[in-house]
Amino acid sequence: MTRTLLALLAALLVLDPAAALAQRQYIDVGSPDFRPLAIAVVPFQSGPGAQADAVDVQLTFRDDLSLTGIFDLLDPRSFLADASEGTQASTIKFRRWSDVGAEGLVKATVKREGALVAGELHLYDVRAGREVLYRVYRERTARALAHRFADDVLQYYTREPGVFRTRIAAIRKTQGAWDIVLLDADGKGAETLRRETAIALLPTWRPDGGEILFTSYRSGKPEIWALRVPDGTPRPVVSLGDLASGGVYSPDGRRIAFTASVDGNSDVYVAGADGSGIRRLTADPATDTSPTWSPDGRRIAFVSSRSGNPHIYVMNADGSEQRRLTFQGNYNQTPRWSPRGDQIAFTARDERRVFDVFLISPETGKIARVTQDQGLTNEEPSWAANGRLLVFVTDRGGRQQLVISNPVGDKQRVVTSDPAGLVAPSWGPLPP
């Protein structure tokens, strides 16, 4: 019976080559055979009064796909087919799109519906000659619509959620103030969540996106506070000893790990999300700081100088089985565990005293370099929610700005040009 069923399935694939071709549309980004998928984005059509919106949606959509590093966006000047051929698969000349190398084809129409920007997205599998995705959305802005489209296309091809509707928190130092700002995932659309007149550092997101922890000096010493999103309402969380800083939520949002200095010694602590039930995890005479949770909440990576210089260590979430992870470099800091669990991103200073971003496997200790010869400082990495992109700080343009990069480091882009500069990025969770 099993052999008969397998034979029938094989026969169906032979009889329906489109189905077989469609199977190859899945992009396995982690595969050694990975190559970018060639995709044609036809100039978006517009309804009355929506011409500017259509242009904005198209440009943002293309920019989003380009940032992922997994698409090869074809030059519209190479297109052979008539852009007005319609959206019905039966009217599309797929052979002409195939002749220019397209594997995927995107068409869209953008309209105005009162205060909303509405859009229809069509995605086609060129080799199979059929439509594979159709979406209709209404959003408040053209950029929001574009991010929605990009997330859907990314999820179709990778079978993983897109991240372009997420936000990035960062710190902007202005004259006499520190702004906690929120940006879109492409580095644009910055808005100030809260302005602090005291030093504000190290924002990190709650897993549901409803709150951001940060380190505040409003009392004169470092304390951990939280800001409600989206209105920026603050609340105190932890004040302990000489300092409490660098708070990070556990993956379930019920606990926070942080650094505190009691009696002059910095160690890693945990507490409830409301600051209660504080418990010390490390008790080494050296400095222990910068905790980051594994995605399953069972382990914590942190920085310790117990070996003489700052290195990355890993321990169980209860503080047991502390072990050194990095043995290369003499100044390793700011670890951030990937949501996929397989890598920890961190900053390291090399032999030229240049700071760069690296990755290390928490299981094998194998190290990979993300940045090199791209300015004097690349630091403070933070992962996108799908673990496929990183944001970090660079000085390669003179002033500190944010870079989006794939983990391999061969696709990088400076995505901000803030006059005051931006530091301490934290990439937020997927929207509900």
Regions found by a protein language model. Give the residues of each.
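Hydrophobic beta-strand positions that form the internal "hydrophobic ladder"
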Residues: 168, 212-213, 253-257, 297-301, ...
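Amphipathic beta-strand/beta-sheet edge segments enriched in Tyr/Trp
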Residues: 25, 87-152
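Structural motif
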Residues: 116-118, 176-181, 221-225, 265-269, ...
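Residue-level detector of Asp-centered blade-edge/turn motifs that repeat once per structural unit
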Residues: 162-164, 207-208, 251-252, 295-296, ...
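Short beta-strand->alpha-helix linker/helix-N-cap micro-motif
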Residues: 28-93, 106-112
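Multi-bladed beta-propeller domains
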Residues: 184-201, 227-245, 271-289, 315-331, ...
